[in-house]
Protein backbone atom coordinates (compact mmCIF):
# COMPACT_ATOMS: atom_id res chain seq x y z
CA UNK A 1 0.00 0.00 0.00
CA UNK A 2 1.34 3.41 -0.96
CA UNK A 3 2.17 5.92 1.77
CA UNK A 4 0.06 9.07 1.92
CA UNK A 5 3.04 11.10 0.65
CA UNK A 6 3.76 8.80 -2.30
CA UNK A 7 3.13 9.70 -5.93
CA UNK A 8 -0.12 7.90 -6.68
CA UNK A 9 -0.64 7.15 -10.40
CA UNK A 10 -4.39 7.49 -9.85
CA UNK A 11 -3.80 11.10 -8.77
CA UNK A 12 -1.33 12.02 -11.50
CA UNK A 13 -1.42 15.60 -12.77
CA UNK A 14 -1.78 14.05 -16.21
CA UNK A 15 -0.17 14.54 -19.61
CA UNK A 16 0.28 17.62 -21.76
CA UNK A 17 -1.95 15.94 -24.36
CA UNK A 18 -4.89 14.20 -22.76
CA UNK A 19 -5.20 10.45 -23.37
CA UNK A 20 -7.65 7.75 -22.33
CA UNK A 21 -6.16 5.58 -19.51
CA UNK A 22 -5.55 1.88 -20.14
CA UNK A 23 -7.13 -0.83 -17.99
CA UNK A 24 -4.03 -3.01 -17.67
CA UNK A 25 -1.29 -0.51 -16.74
CA UNK A 26 -1.17 2.45 -14.39
CA UNK A 27 0.03 5.79 -15.76
CA UNK A 28 3.63 5.38 -14.57
CA UNK A 29 3.89 1.84 -15.96
CA UNK A 30 2.66 3.21 -19.27
CA UNK A 31 5.40 5.85 -19.18
CA UNK A 32 8.03 3.22 -18.37
CA UNK A 33 7.00 1.21 -21.42
CA UNK A 34 7.02 4.28 -23.65
CA UNK A 35 10.58 5.10 -22.56
CA UNK A 36 11.78 1.54 -23.20
CA UNK A 37 10.30 1.66 -26.71
CA UNK A 38 12.10 4.88 -27.69
CA UNK A 39 14.97 4.94 -30.15
CA UNK A 40 16.97 6.94 -27.60
CA UNK A 41 16.69 4.16 -25.01
CA UNK A 42 17.90 1.50 -27.44
CA UNK A 43 20.86 3.67 -28.46
CA UNK A 44 22.09 3.71 -24.85
CA UNK A 45 23.45 0.21 -25.49
CA UNK A 46 26.21 1.75 -27.59
CA UNK A 47 26.96 4.79 -25.47
CA UNK A 48 29.87 5.07 -23.04
CA UNK A 49 29.60 4.74 -19.29
CA UNK A 50 33.36 4.82 -18.57
CA UNK A 51 34.83 2.67 -21.34
CA UNK A 52 33.85 3.21 -24.98
CA UNK A 53 31.92 0.36 -26.52
CA UNK A 54 34.69 -1.52 -28.31
CA UNK A 55 36.92 -1.62 -25.19
CA UNK A 56 35.27 -4.85 -24.08
CA UNK A 57 32.01 -6.77 -24.00
CA UNK A 58 31.69 -6.94 -20.23
CA UNK A 59 32.04 -3.29 -19.27
CA UNK A 60 28.93 -1.31 -18.49
CA UNK A 61 27.35 1.00 -21.01
CA UNK A 62 24.62 3.61 -20.55
CA UNK A 63 21.90 1.01 -21.07
CA UNK A 64 23.15 -1.53 -18.52
CA UNK A 65 23.80 1.33 -16.10
CA UNK A 66 20.26 2.65 -16.51
CA UNK A 67 18.81 -0.82 -15.92
CA UNK A 68 20.91 -1.23 -12.77
CA UNK A 69 19.86 2.18 -11.47
CA UNK A 70 16.21 1.32 -12.10
CA UNK A 71 16.39 -1.89 -10.04
CA UNK A 72 18.01 -0.08 -7.11
CA UNK A 73 15.44 2.72 -7.32
CA UNK A 74 12.56 0.27 -7.46
CA UNK A 75 13.77 -1.67 -4.40
CA UNK A 76 14.24 1.49 -2.33
CA UNK A 77 10.84 2.89 -3.31
CA UNK A 78 9.11 -0.39 -2.51
CA UNK A 79 10.66 -0.50 0.95
CA UNK A 80 9.53 3.06 1.68
CA UNK A 81 5.97 2.42 0.40
CA UNK A 82 6.51 4.86 -2.44
CA UNK A 83 5.68 4.38 -6.11
CA UNK A 84 8.26 1.91 -7.38
CA UNK A 85 6.86 2.36 -10.90
CA UNK A 86 7.61 6.09 -10.87
CA UNK A 87 11.07 5.66 -9.34
CA UNK A 88 11.91 2.97 -11.90
CA UNK A 89 10.63 5.06 -14.82
CA UNK A 90 12.62 8.16 -13.88
CA UNK A 91 15.73 6.01 -13.40
CA UNK A 92 15.34 4.44 -16.83
CA UNK A 93 15.08 7.88 -18.45
CA UNK A 94 17.75 9.75 -16.50
CA UNK A 95 20.57 9.20 -19.03
CA UNK A 96 18.64 9.44 -22.31
CA UNK A 97 20.17 12.82 -23.12
CA UNK A 98 23.79 11.73 -22.83
CA UNK A 99 26.08 12.24 -25.81
CA UNK A 100 28.34 9.58 -27.27
CA UNK A 101 31.56 9.06 -25.26
CA UNK A 102 30.04 9.87 -21.87
CA UNK A 103 31.10 12.97 -19.96
CA UNK A 104 33.99 13.66 -22.36
CA UNK A 105 31.47 13.91 -25.18
CA UNK A 106 29.18 16.16 -23.16
CA UNK A 107 32.02 18.51 -22.19
CA UNK A 108 33.08 18.73 -25.82
CA UNK A 109 29.58 19.42 -27.13
CA UNK A 110 28.99 21.99 -24.39
CA UNK A 111 32.21 23.75 -25.46
CA UNK A 112 31.04 23.72 -29.09
CA UNK A 113 27.72 25.21 -27.99
CA UNK A 114 29.11 27.87 -25.63
CA UNK A 115 27.95 30.69 -27.93
CA UNK A 116 24.56 29.04 -28.39
CA UNK A 117 23.41 28.58 -24.77
CA UNK A 118 25.49 25.47 -24.09
CA UNK A 119 24.53 21.80 -23.86
CA UNK A 120 23.08 19.89 -20.88
CA UNK A 121 22.31 16.16 -20.95
CA UNK A 122 19.54 16.72 -18.40
CA UNK A 123 17.76 19.23 -20.64
CA UNK A 124 18.44 16.96 -23.61
CA UNK A 125 16.61 14.10 -21.87
CA UNK A 126 13.55 16.36 -21.57
CA UNK A 127 13.89 17.43 -25.20
CA UNK A 128 14.08 13.83 -26.43
CA UNK A 129 10.95 12.84 -24.53
CA UNK A 130 8.90 15.93 -25.40
CA UNK A 131 10.10 16.82 -28.91
CA UNK A 132 12.74 14.71 -30.66
CA UNK A 133 11.13 11.27 -30.42
CA UNK A 134 8.55 11.00 -33.20
CA UNK A 135 6.41 7.93 -32.62
CA UNK A 136 2.87 9.30 -32.48
CA UNK A 137 0.71 11.01 -35.09
CA UNK A 138 -1.01 13.38 -32.65
CA UNK A 139 2.04 15.01 -31.02
CA UNK A 140 5.84 15.27 -30.84
CA UNK A 141 7.62 13.37 -28.09
CA UNK A 142 6.06 10.52 -26.11
CA UNK A 143 3.63 12.53 -23.94
CA UNK A 144 4.71 11.38 -20.48
CA UNK A 145 3.00 12.26 -17.21
CA UNK A 146 3.85 15.44 -15.35
CA UNK A 147 5.41 13.45 -12.49
CA UNK A 148 7.90 11.64 -14.73
CA UNK A 149 8.97 14.82 -16.53
CA UNK A 150 9.28 16.68 -13.22
CA UNK A 151 11.45 13.87 -11.90
CA UNK A 152 13.74 13.87 -14.91
CA UNK A 153 14.26 17.63 -14.85
CA UNK A 154 14.52 18.08 -11.06
CA UNK A 155 15.93 14.76 -9.83
CA UNK A 156 19.04 16.61 -8.61
CA UNK A 157 17.01 19.28 -6.83
CA UNK A 158 15.26 22.60 -7.53
CA UNK A 159 16.42 24.65 -10.51
CA UNK A 160 17.11 28.29 -9.79
CA UNK A 161 19.10 31.09 -11.37
CA UNK A 162 19.81 30.70 -15.08
CA UNK A 163 17.52 28.03 -16.53
CA UNK A 164 18.42 25.98 -19.60
CA UNK A 165 16.77 27.38 -22.74
CA UNK A 166 14.76 24.26 -23.60
CA UNK A 167 13.69 23.58 -20.01
CA UNK A 168 12.45 27.17 -19.80
CA UNK A 169 10.63 26.86 -23.12
CA UNK A 170 8.90 23.62 -22.14
CA UNK A 171 8.14 24.89 -18.65
CA UNK A 172 6.22 27.82 -20.13
CA UNK A 173 3.59 25.41 -21.49
CA UNK A 174 3.70 22.75 -18.75
CA UNK A 175 4.83 24.21 -15.42
CA UNK A 176 7.16 21.75 -13.67
CA UNK A 177 7.50 24.01 -10.61
CA UNK A 178 11.25 24.32 -11.04
CA UNK A 179 11.86 26.09 -7.72
CA UNK A 180 10.65 23.15 -5.59
CA UNK A 181 12.06 19.70 -4.87
CA UNK A 182 10.80 16.80 -6.96
CA UNK A 183 8.89 13.84 -5.54
CA UNK A 184 10.56 11.40 -3.16
CA UNK A 185 10.57 8.89 -6.02
CA UNK A 186 12.65 11.26 -8.19
CA UNK A 187 15.06 11.85 -5.31
CA UNK A 188 15.41 8.08 -4.94
CA UNK A 189 16.26 7.76 -8.65
CA UNK A 190 19.02 10.36 -8.28
CA UNK A 191 20.66 8.62 -5.32
CA UNK A 192 20.18 5.19 -6.89
CA UNK A 193 22.30 6.60 -9.73
CA UNK A 194 25.04 7.53 -7.24
CA UNK A 195 24.90 4.12 -5.56
CA UNK A 196 25.12 2.31 -8.89
CA UNK A 197 27.80 4.30 -10.62
CA UNK A 198 30.31 4.55 -7.78
CA UNK A 199 29.96 0.83 -7.06
CA UNK A 200 30.09 -0.37 -10.63
CA UNK A 201 32.79 2.04 -11.81
CA UNK A 202 35.00 0.53 -9.09
CA UNK A 203 34.18 -2.96 -10.36
CA UNK A 204 34.77 -2.13 -14.04
CA UNK A 205 38.00 -0.28 -13.27
CA UNK A 206 39.40 -3.28 -11.39
CA UNK A 207 38.35 -5.52 -14.29
CA UNK A 208 40.05 -3.19 -16.78
CA UNK A 209 43.21 -3.12 -14.61
CA UNK A 210 43.15 0.66 -14.34
CA UNK A 211 43.28 0.22 -10.57
CA UNK A 212 44.02 -2.78 -8.36
CA UNK A 213 43.25 -3.87 -4.82
CA UNK A 214 46.37 -2.09 -3.55
CA UNK A 215 44.85 1.19 -4.77
CA UNK A 216 41.65 0.42 -2.86
CA UNK A 217 43.70 0.61 0.35
CA UNK A 218 43.32 4.40 -0.03
CA UNK A 219 39.65 3.90 0.83
CA UNK A 220 39.81 2.49 4.37
CA UNK A 221 36.10 1.76 4.34
CA UNK A 222 36.44 -0.37 1.17
CA UNK A 223 39.77 -1.89 2.18
CA UNK A 224 38.17 -3.27 5.34
CA UNK A 225 35.72 -5.23 3.19
CA UNK A 226 38.62 -6.59 1.12
CA UNK A 227 40.47 -7.69 4.26
CA UNK A 228 37.41 -9.41 5.75
CA UNK A 229 36.60 -11.26 2.53
CA UNK A 230 40.19 -12.43 2.02
CA UNK A 231 40.29 -13.64 5.62
CA UNK A 232 37.06 -15.59 5.24
CA UNK A 233 37.70 -16.98 1.74
CA UNK A 234 41.41 -17.80 1.45
CA UNK A 235 41.37 -18.69 -2.26
CA UNK A 236 38.89 -16.09 -3.50
CA UNK A 237 39.53 -14.96 -7.08
CA UNK A 238 39.99 -11.29 -7.95
CA UNK A 239 36.80 -11.21 -10.02
CA UNK A 240 34.78 -12.74 -7.19
CA UNK A 241 36.44 -10.49 -4.62
CA UNK A 242 35.53 -7.22 -6.34
CA UNK A 243 31.99 -8.47 -6.93
CA UNK A 244 31.59 -9.26 -3.22
CA UNK A 245 33.09 -5.89 -2.25
CA UNK A 246 30.65 -4.06 -4.53
CA UNK A 247 27.78 -6.17 -3.24
CA UNK A 248 28.59 -5.21 0.36
CA UNK A 249 29.06 -1.56 -0.58
CA UNK A 250 25.70 -1.34 -2.34
CA UNK A 251 23.90 -3.10 0.51
CA UNK A 252 25.35 -0.72 3.09
CA UNK A 253 24.59 2.39 1.02
CA UNK A 254 20.98 1.31 0.44
CA UNK A 255 20.48 0.37 4.10
CA UNK A 256 21.90 3.71 5.21
CA UNK A 257 19.69 5.65 2.79
CA UNK A 258 16.58 3.81 3.98
CA UNK A 259 17.36 4.56 7.63
CA UNK A 260 18.10 8.26 7.08
CA UNK A 261 15.09 8.80 4.81
CA UNK A 262 12.69 7.17 7.28
CA UNK A 263 14.22 9.35 10.01
CA UNK A 264 13.69 12.50 7.91
CA UNK A 265 10.07 11.57 7.12
CA UNK A 266 9.29 10.95 10.79
CA UNK A 267 11.08 14.11 11.94
CA UNK A 268 9.16 16.30 9.48
CA UNK A 269 5.88 14.43 10.13
CA UNK A 270 5.35 14.12 6.38
CA UNK A 271 1.79 13.21 5.36
CA UNK A 272 1.49 14.64 1.82
CA UNK A 273 3.67 14.83 -1.27
CA UNK A 274 3.49 18.64 -1.38
CA UNK A 275 5.27 18.75 1.99
CA UNK A 276 8.18 16.89 0.39
CA UNK A 277 8.28 19.31 -2.54
CA UNK A 278 8.21 22.39 -0.31
CA UNK A 279 10.87 21.35 2.21
CA UNK A 280 14.11 23.31 2.24
CA UNK A 281 16.16 20.11 1.85
CA UNK A 282 15.78 16.78 0.09
CA UNK A 283 13.91 14.22 2.15
CA UNK A 284 15.72 11.23 0.62
CA UNK A 285 19.34 11.18 1.75
CA UNK A 286 22.21 9.29 3.33
CA UNK A 287 23.56 9.88 6.82
CA UNK A 288 26.27 12.53 7.13
CA UNK A 289 28.92 9.84 7.67
CA UNK A 290 27.92 7.97 4.52
CA UNK A 291 27.77 11.17 2.46
CA UNK A 292 31.40 11.77 3.44
CA UNK A 293 32.34 8.23 2.40
CA UNK A 294 30.60 8.71 -0.94
CA UNK A 295 32.57 11.94 -1.50
CA UNK A 296 35.79 10.01 -0.80
CA UNK A 297 34.88 7.30 -3.30
CA UNK A 298 33.95 9.88 -5.97
CA UNK A 299 37.25 11.71 -5.40
CA UNK A 300 39.14 8.42 -5.66
CA UNK A 301 37.37 7.53 -8.92
CA UNK A 302 38.02 10.98 -10.34
CA UNK A 303 41.74 10.93 -9.56
CA UNK A 304 42.54 7.24 -10.07
CA UNK A 305 40.17 6.31 -12.89
CA UNK A 306 38.65 9.22 -14.83
CA UNK A 307 41.99 11.09 -14.90
CA UNK A 308 44.09 7.97 -15.55
CA UNK A 309 46.36 7.98 -18.61
CA UNK A 310 44.21 5.40 -20.36
CA UNK A 311 40.90 7.21 -19.87
CA UNK A 312 42.49 10.60 -20.59
CA UNK A 313 43.91 9.33 -23.89
CA UNK A 314 40.50 7.96 -24.90
CA UNK A 315 38.79 11.20 -23.84
CA UNK A 316 41.12 13.27 -26.04
CA UNK A 317 40.19 11.17 -29.06
CA UNK A 318 36.50 11.45 -28.21
CA UNK A 319 36.80 15.23 -27.87
CA UNK A 320 38.42 15.42 -31.29
CA UNK A 321 35.58 13.39 -32.83
CA UNK A 322 32.75 15.46 -31.32
CA UNK A 323 34.38 18.80 -32.10
CA UNK A 324 35.37 17.65 -35.58
CA UNK A 325 31.83 16.57 -36.43
CA UNK A 326 30.35 19.80 -35.07
CA UNK A 327 32.78 21.85 -37.16
CA UNK A 328 32.10 20.08 -40.47
CA UNK A 329 28.32 20.20 -40.01
CA UNK A 330 28.44 23.90 -39.13
CA UNK A 331 30.51 24.55 -42.27
CA UNK A 332 28.18 22.56 -44.52
CA UNK A 333 24.69 21.59 -43.33
CA UNK A 334 24.24 19.55 -46.52
CA UNK A 335 26.27 16.85 -44.78
CA UNK A 336 23.38 16.36 -42.36
CA UNK A 337 20.61 13.88 -43.16
CA UNK A 338 17.75 15.63 -44.97
CA UNK A 339 15.26 15.10 -42.14
CA UNK A 340 17.61 17.00 -39.81
CA UNK A 341 18.66 19.71 -42.26
CA UNK A 342 15.08 20.77 -43.00
CA UNK A 343 14.49 21.52 -39.31
CA UNK A 344 16.94 24.44 -39.34
CA UNK A 345 15.18 27.78 -38.95
CA UNK A 346 17.03 30.40 -40.99
CA UNK A 347 15.44 33.17 -38.91
CA UNK A 348 16.92 31.86 -35.65
CA UNK A 349 20.70 32.43 -35.28
CA UNK A 350 21.02 29.52 -32.82
CA UNK A 351 18.90 27.07 -34.79
CA UNK A 352 21.65 25.55 -36.95
CA UNK A 353 23.97 24.89 -33.99
CA UNK A 354 21.12 23.51 -31.88
CA UNK A 355 19.94 21.08 -34.59
CA UNK A 356 23.53 19.91 -35.10
CA UNK A 357 23.97 19.43 -31.35
CA UNK A 358 20.75 17.40 -31.19
CA UNK A 359 21.98 15.22 -34.05
CA UNK A 360 25.43 14.61 -32.53
CA UNK A 361 24.00 14.02 -29.04
CA UNK A 362 21.82 11.24 -30.42
CA UNK A 363 24.75 9.36 -31.96
CA UNK A 364 26.13 6.14 -30.52
CA UNK A 365 29.87 5.84 -29.94
CA UNK A 366 30.40 3.64 -32.97
CA UNK A 367 28.26 5.78 -35.31
CA UNK A 368 30.14 8.93 -34.23
CA UNK A 369 33.47 7.20 -34.95
CA UNK A 370 32.18 5.96 -38.31
CA UNK A 371 30.83 9.40 -39.25
CA UNK A 372 34.08 11.11 -38.20
CA UNK A 373 36.13 8.69 -40.30
CA UNK A 374 33.80 9.32 -43.23
CA UNK A 375 33.79 13.12 -43.03
CA UNK A 376 37.03 14.13 -41.34
CA UNK A 377 39.57 11.45 -42.26
CA UNK A 378 42.16 11.99 -45.00
CA UNK A 379 41.97 8.28 -45.80
CA UNK A 380 40.20 8.19 -49.17
CA UNK A 381 39.23 4.54 -48.62
CA UNK A 382 36.57 5.88 -46.23
CA UNK A 383 34.80 7.79 -48.99
Curated annotation (Swiss-Prot):
Assigned keywords, A-Z: Hydrolase
Record flagged with keyword Hydrolase: yes
Organism superkingdom: Bacteria
Cited Gene3D superfamilies: Hypothetical protein af1432
Any one GO MF annotation of this record: dGTPase activity
InterPro entries: dGTPase, dGTPase-like, dNTPase_2, HD/PDEase_dom, HD_domain, PHydrolase_assoc_dom
Domain HD: from-to ranges: 62-198
Covalent S-S links between cysteines: none
SMART domains in the cross-refs: HDc
GO biological process, one term: dGTP catabolic process
Pfam families to which the protein is assigned, alphabetical: HD, HD_assoc
Family statement: Belongs to the dGTPase family. Type 2 subfamily.
Protein name: Deoxyguanosinetriphosphate triphosphohydrolase-like protein
UniProt source species: Rickettsia bellii (strain RML369-C)
Amino acid sequence: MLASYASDPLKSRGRLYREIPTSYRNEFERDRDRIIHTNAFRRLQYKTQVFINHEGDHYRNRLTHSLEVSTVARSIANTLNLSSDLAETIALAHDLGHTPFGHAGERSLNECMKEHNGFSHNAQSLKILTLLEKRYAAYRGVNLTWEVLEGIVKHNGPISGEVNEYIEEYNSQNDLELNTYASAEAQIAALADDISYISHDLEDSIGAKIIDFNNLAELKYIDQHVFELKSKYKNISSSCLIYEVVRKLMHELITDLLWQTKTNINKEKITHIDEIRNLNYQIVDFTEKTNERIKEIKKFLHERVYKSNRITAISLKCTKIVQGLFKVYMEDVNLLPVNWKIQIDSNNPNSKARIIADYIAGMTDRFAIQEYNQLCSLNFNNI
